[in-house]
A protein has these predicted regions:
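Short active-site segment of divalent metal-dependent hydrolases/proteases
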Residues: 12, 149-150
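Acidic, low-complexity terminal tails and accessory targeting/binding regions
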Residues: 1-2, 80-92, 134-140, 155-194
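Internal catalytic-core helix/loop-beta-alpha segment
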Residues: 100-136
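Short, hydrophobic/glycine-enriched beta-strand segments
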Residues: 3-9, 143
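Loop-to-helix element that buttresses phosphate recognition and phosphoryl-transfer chemistry
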Residues: 8-62, 111-126
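Short basic (Lys/Arg) and small-residue
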Residues: 146
Length: 194
């Protein structure tokens, strides 16, 4: 049985400033490009049966710089849709909604999109996990995507509700490895850098 490797894209201007970034297609910063390239030695010798990326440029570029040959683009790997909070920091949101928490409240609709609840993001994560399940007996699977989405996917892989993704802080330009032990899913590595 292969492992599930989660690769968070390298740094962008908005990830550095703390702005919520879902559909805004920002490039990697020079530091983000460095982060992505430094992942190549961690991934070079893995027996990948499947490599999927988010459709957004920051994920596709991270995969390329990390030496991963993407076998497909999966729209379900896009980041949590932040709706009205796209481009806004948590600090700014708390000025008008002091008790707001993404993990319980989700994101409200905005002019550029509907926003998503934790449950909606969890359903996307479940679809991705179902799609990759058939490849895991043949080797490792890499998913190159985004912070909040990969945290939800981790929670779902471990059998937890989507909101428990809050427990897994995920840095830019890192690899996480989800494996199994005695037939049960486990976190084998988290926030690994070269």
């Amino acid at each position: 049985m292969g492992d599930l490797l989660l690769v968070r894209h390298g740094e962008t201007e908005w990830s550095r400033s703390g702005q919520h970034t879902s559909f805004t297609d920002l490039p990697l910063t020079p530091r983000g490009e460095e982060q992505a390239g430094s992942l190549a030695p961690l991934l070079a010798d893995r027996p990948f049966a499947l490599v999927l990326t988010s459709p957004l440029a920051r994920a596709v570029r991270t995969a390329a710089l990390a030496g991963l040959k993407a076998t497909g683009v999966d729209p379900d790997l896009h980041e949590w849709h932040y709706g009205a909070y796209e481009g806004v920091t948590t600090e700014e949101i708390h000025r008008t909604r002091p008790d707001w928490d993404l993990w319980t409240d989700g994101a409200p609709p905005g002019p550029d999109g509907p926003g998503e609840s934790p449950e909606e993001v969890g359903k996307r994560a479940d679809r991705v996990l179902a799609r990759v399940a058939g490849a895991l007996p043949e080797g490792d699977v890499a998913l190159v995507a985004h912070g909040h989405f990969l945290r939800v996917l981790t929670a779902r892989r471990l059998g937890l509700p989507p909101s428990e993704g809050r427990l897994f802080r995920l840095e830019t330009g890192t690899v996480c490895r989800l494996s199994t032990e005695h037939g049960r899913p486990v976190i084998a590595e988290w926030n690994t850098r070269a």
